[in-house]
Structure formats: structure tokens, C-alpha cells
């Protein structure tokens, strides 16, 4: 594809890193944009955007704002990136808050969890915005027709959960989406919905719990398989399946 990349950051360090990689044939597609500041992971995202005007995250978003780039990809401070995008690019009409969408493997494909941590205390109206954005994103990127949207809750029955969840449920019923009701945690990976919405506090806990549990399962398997030569032989024969499952559950593939 005809894609160009602008690396934003300390130009000297970026170029040193590029020198140790084989970029032959890509030189014309790669440029550097110097940024003198960095948002550290322990900083407040919103404050960093206001105070560090020349941070790599702020400058990268500025490039999109000025029409010099079409998108930003970052492994940096999530809160700072969301804040910078919201302040500099604004949100879509009818959408008040940005939400973090994370594609997660499930039976028969993937589902989208939104919000994964951008808003820990949103209003029910914000959650409806997440549902609309998530539905459009899933249909556009993953495909497969109109996405089913479920509300993460402690049970599937209507009327379950906190007052916040009940308010979200009522508004989602009226939203221009295919809302299928509440979804309890044990039903998510059965892909009862293509899009699962929740507040960022709940979503982030869910993501990190799943990540930690997946790693623990592989640790337990390793201990059990090392109990006998016969088990180790069986594990060797099934190594391809283990590798495939490990890759599917890796946060390197799906985020977390």
C-alpha cells in the first residue's frame, strides 16, 4: 500500500534506531519530525498536553490537525493521546467523549470492548456514544453486517445492575444500534455480541483481569506438563496448538 510514515520524537534517537533496521527501499516513505519533550507514563495525561506543547504525542496529533498526516499510532501515554486528540481534533457531532475500543478474541472471531479505560466515570449518554462508535467501527473494520451491541453487566436480565447500568440500558434501547441487552462476564467470550460497552473503569479492570488470567493459565499448564515425561511428550506433539492459542491471547496482538 502507498503509506508514508512520519516518526515523531527525538530525531537523533529515532534515526539511530532506524540505522539498526533494514529500511532499504523505504527511505522515500519515512521522515522524522523532531519533538523535544516526552510524556512520561506517570504524568497526568490532560496536564501533560497543556504543559508539554512539544511532546511527541502533541506534535503527532498536530500533524493530523494540520493535514500533514491522516492518523496517529502510539505506544505511549494513552490518557495523553486521548486528551490531545479530543482537544486538538475535537469529537464527532453528537459524540461527547472518545472511547478506547479493543478487539478481543472470542469464539468464532473477535469482539470489540469499548470503553477500555479512557473514561472511568462517564455518563449514560457517553456510553451510548461508545455504542454507536463501536458499532460503526466493527461493521467498517471487521465486517459481517450490523453489529450486535451488549451492555456489560452482572446478569443478562433487564433491570440488573447499578442505577448507572439501568440508565444506560434505557438509553441504549432507543439508540440507532442493534442493542441485544445486558451481557454477563461469562457470556462475553461466547460472542453473544460483537460490541460490548461499559464505562472505562469496568472495561480496564476486565481487560487486565483477562490478560493476567491468560498468562496464569499458561503458567499452570507449564507446571502440570512438566510433572512427567509422558505429559511433556504430549505437549511437544501439541506445541503448534499451544503456540496458536498463546498468540491469540497475547496483548501484543490485541492490546490491553
Question: Where do the PLM segments sit?
Answer:
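Glycine-rich phosphate/diphosphate-binding loop of Rossmann-like nucleotide-binding domains
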Residues: 2-6, 11-15, 120-185, 194
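Glycine-rich phosphate/nucleotide-binding loop
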Residues: 6, 86-99, 106-113, 192-196, ...
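General beta-strand structural signal in soluble alpha/beta enzymes
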Residues: 7-9, 32-34, 71-75, 114, ...
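N-terminal short beta-loop-beta anion/metal-coordinating cradle
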Residues: 14-41, 95-98, 102-106
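Phosphate/nucleotide-donor binding subsite
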Residues: 23-69
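Short glycine-rich anion-binding loops that position phosphate/pyrophosphate groups of nucleotides
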Residues: 37-38, 77-79, 87, 154-157, ...
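Glycine/threonine-rich beta-strand-loop-alpha-helix active-site module
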Residues: 70, 76-126, 130
